């Protein structure tokens, strides 16, 4: 929840979810 993964999730889910990232406020974050 604190480290940006450099990916947005406005229209599509986080592809970086495979790396432990999740969507928060339209941006993918890790932890």
From Swiss-Prot:
In terms of InterPro entries, this protein maps to:
Cyclotide, Cyclotide_bracelet_CS, Cyclotide_sf
**Is the Disulfide bond keyword given for this protein?**
yes
UniProt KW keywords: Disulfide bond, Knottin, Plant defense
Disulfide bond positions: 5-21, 9-23, 14-28
| Statement: the UniProt record of this protein carries the keyword tRNA-binding | no
What is the location of the Cyclopeptide (Gly-Asn) cross-link?
1-31
| PTM per Swiss-Prot/TrEMBL | This is a cyclic peptide.
Q: Which GO terms describe its biological process?
A: defense response
Q: What does this protein do?
A: Probably participates in a plant defense mechanism.
Q: What is known of its domains?
A: The presence of a 'disulfide through disulfide knot' structurally defines this protein as a knottin.
The record's similarity note reads: Belongs to the cyclotide family. Bracelet subfamily.
Q: What is this protein called?
A: Cyclotide vibi-F
Q: Which organism is it from?
A: Viola biflora
């Amino acid at each position: 929840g604190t480290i940006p993964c450099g990916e947005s999730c406005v229209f599509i889910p986080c592809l970086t979810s495979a790396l432990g990232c999740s969507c928060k406020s339209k941006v993918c974050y890790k932890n």
